Amino acid sequence: MHPLTLPKQSRVLKRKQFLYITRSGFCCRGSQATFYVVPSRHPGTCRMGITVSKKFGKAHERNSFKRVVREVFRHVRHQLPNCQIVVFPKGHKQRPVFSKLLQDFINQIPEGLHRLGKTKATTGGECTPKSEKCVTAPR
Protein backbone atom coordinates (compact mmCIF):
# COMPACT_ATOMS: atom_id res chain seq x y z
CA MET A 1 0.00 0.00 0.00
CA HIS A 2 1.19 3.53 -0.72
CA PRO A 3 2.68 5.14 2.44
CA LEU A 4 0.63 8.36 2.13
CA THR A 5 -2.79 6.75 2.12
CA LEU A 6 -5.29 7.11 4.93
CA PRO A 7 -6.97 3.73 5.38
CA LYS A 8 -10.19 3.31 7.32
CA GLN A 9 -8.42 1.76 10.34
CA SER A 10 -6.40 5.00 10.71
CA ARG A 11 -9.53 7.11 11.21
CA VAL A 12 -11.77 7.65 14.21
CA LEU A 13 -15.24 7.11 12.78
CA LYS A 14 -17.86 6.59 15.49
CA ARG A 15 -19.39 9.08 17.88
CA LYS A 16 -18.60 6.78 20.81
CA GLN A 17 -14.90 6.87 19.88
CA PHE A 18 -14.90 10.67 19.54
CA LEU A 19 -16.56 11.04 22.95
CA TYR A 20 -14.10 8.64 24.60
CA ILE A 21 -11.09 10.52 23.23
CA THR A 22 -12.39 14.00 24.08
CA ARG A 23 -13.50 12.98 27.59
CA SER A 24 -10.52 10.91 28.65
CA GLY A 25 -7.82 12.47 26.47
CA PHE A 26 -5.35 15.21 27.22
CA CYS A 27 -5.96 18.58 25.58
CA CYS A 28 -3.06 20.14 23.64
CA ARG A 29 -3.40 23.48 21.90
CA GLY A 30 -1.32 24.35 18.90
CA SER A 31 -1.29 27.52 16.83
CA GLN A 32 -3.84 26.20 14.31
CA ALA A 33 -5.78 23.47 16.13
CA THR A 34 -6.66 21.88 19.45
CA PHE A 35 -5.83 18.19 19.87
CA TYR A 36 -7.22 15.62 22.29
CA VAL A 37 -4.85 12.68 22.63
CA VAL A 38 -5.10 9.25 24.27
CA PRO A 39 -2.71 6.30 23.97
CA SER A 40 -3.85 3.64 21.51
CA ARG A 41 -4.77 0.16 22.72
CA HIS A 42 -3.46 -1.44 19.53
CA PRO A 43 0.31 -1.33 18.90
CA GLY A 44 1.47 0.21 15.66
CA THR A 45 -1.65 2.28 15.05
CA CYS A 46 -2.20 5.99 15.16
CA ARG A 47 -5.78 7.07 14.50
CA MET A 48 -7.24 10.52 13.92
CA GLY A 49 -10.67 12.11 13.76
CA ILE A 50 -11.59 15.68 12.84
CA THR A 51 -14.46 17.71 14.25
CA VAL A 52 -15.38 21.06 12.70
CA SER A 53 -18.59 22.77 13.81
CA LYS A 54 -20.77 24.99 11.65
CA LYS A 55 -19.54 27.98 13.66
CA PHE A 56 -16.22 27.63 11.83
CA GLY A 57 -17.74 28.77 8.57
CA LYS A 58 -19.42 27.59 5.43
CA ALA A 59 -19.07 24.05 4.13
CA HIS A 60 -16.20 24.83 1.77
CA GLU A 61 -14.20 26.40 4.64
CA ARG A 62 -14.84 23.41 6.92
CA ASN A 63 -13.93 20.98 4.16
CA SER A 64 -10.76 22.93 3.39
CA PHE A 65 -9.66 22.69 7.04
CA LYS A 66 -10.36 18.94 7.10
CA ARG A 67 -8.47 18.42 3.84
CA VAL A 68 -5.34 20.15 5.14
CA VAL A 69 -5.46 18.29 8.48
CA ARG A 70 -5.83 14.93 6.72
CA GLU A 71 -2.88 15.74 4.46
CA VAL A 72 -0.69 16.68 7.43
CA PHE A 73 -1.71 13.49 9.24
CA ARG A 74 -0.80 11.40 6.19
CA HIS A 75 2.70 12.88 6.26
CA VAL A 76 3.36 12.50 10.02
CA ARG A 77 1.35 9.37 10.84
CA HIS A 78 4.43 7.13 10.91
CA GLN A 79 6.39 9.56 13.12
CA LEU A 80 3.73 9.75 15.82
CA PRO A 81 3.54 7.38 18.79
CA ASN A 82 0.64 4.92 19.13
CA CYS A 83 -2.27 7.20 19.91
CA GLN A 84 -5.77 8.29 19.05
CA ILE A 85 -6.30 11.95 18.19
CA VAL A 86 -9.30 14.21 17.75
CA VAL A 87 -8.61 17.57 16.08
CA PHE A 88 -10.68 20.74 16.51
CA PRO A 89 -9.93 23.98 14.62
CA LYS A 90 -8.71 26.91 16.65
CA GLY A 91 -10.40 30.19 15.85
CA HIS A 92 -13.18 30.96 13.44
CA LYS A 93 -12.59 31.02 9.70
CA GLN A 94 -8.85 30.83 10.20
CA ARG A 95 -7.31 29.42 7.06
CA PRO A 96 -5.05 26.48 7.98
CA VAL A 97 -1.37 26.66 7.12
CA PHE A 98 0.24 23.30 6.29
CA SER A 99 3.63 24.07 7.86
CA LYS A 100 2.14 25.32 11.15
CA LEU A 101 -0.17 22.32 11.43
CA LEU A 102 2.75 20.01 10.69
CA GLN A 103 4.73 21.54 13.56
CA ASP A 104 1.70 21.33 15.86
CA PHE A 105 1.30 17.61 15.13
CA ILE A 106 4.99 16.85 15.63
CA ASN A 107 5.38 18.90 18.83
CA GLN A 108 2.05 18.86 20.66
CA ILE A 109 0.90 15.25 20.35
CA PRO A 110 3.95 13.51 21.89
CA GLU A 111 4.00 16.18 24.62
CA GLY A 112 0.31 15.58 25.34
CA LEU A 113 0.85 11.82 25.62
CA HIS A 114 3.80 12.40 27.93
CA ARG A 115 1.74 14.69 30.18
CA LEU A 116 -1.20 12.27 30.12
CA GLY A 117 1.14 9.52 31.33
CA LYS A 118 2.33 11.74 34.19
CA THR A 119 -1.24 12.66 35.12
CA LYS A 120 -2.36 9.03 35.19
CA ALA A 121 0.70 8.03 37.21
CA THR A 122 0.08 10.68 39.87
CA THR A 123 -3.66 10.11 40.18
CA GLY A 124 -3.57 6.32 40.19
CA GLY A 125 -4.76 5.67 36.66
CA GLU A 126 -7.59 8.18 36.58
CA CYS A 127 -7.38 11.23 34.36
CA THR A 128 -9.77 14.12 34.77
CA PRO A 129 -9.40 16.10 31.56
CA LYS A 130 -11.95 18.77 32.57
CA SER A 131 -9.83 19.80 35.57
CA GLU A 132 -6.59 19.69 33.61
CA LYS A 133 -5.56 22.79 31.73
CA CYS A 134 -4.75 22.58 28.06
CA VAL A 135 -1.14 22.65 26.97
CA THR A 136 -0.57 25.74 24.86
CA ALA A 137 2.05 25.95 22.12
CA PRO A 138 4.79 28.54 22.64
CA ARG A 139 4.39 31.63 20.51
Swiss-Prot record:
Record-level GO cellular component terms: ribonuclease P complex
GO biological process: tRNA 5'-leader removal
Superkingdom as given in the UniProt entry: Bacteria
Quaternary structure and partners: Consists of a catalytic RNA component (M1 or rnpB) and a protein subunit.
Coiled-coil positions: none
UniProt entry keywords in alphabetical sequence: Endonuclease, Hydrolase, Nuclease, RNA-binding, tRNA processing
Task performed by this protein: RNaseP catalyzes the removal of the 5'-leader sequence from pre-tRNA to produce the mature 5'-terminus. It can also cleave other RNA substrates such as 4.5S RNA. The protein component plays an auxiliary but essential role in vivo by binding to the 5'-leader sequence and broadening the substrate specificity of the ribozyme.
This protein's name: Ribonuclease P protein component
The EC number(s) this enzyme carries: 3.1.26.5
Gene that produces this protein: rnpA
Tagged with keyword Protease: no
Homology family: Belongs to the RnpA family.
Record's catalysed reaction(s): Endonucleolytic cleavage of RNA, removing 5'-extranucleotides from tRNA precursor
PANTHER family: RIBONUCLEASE P PROTEIN COMPONENT
Species of provenance: Chlamydia pneumoniae
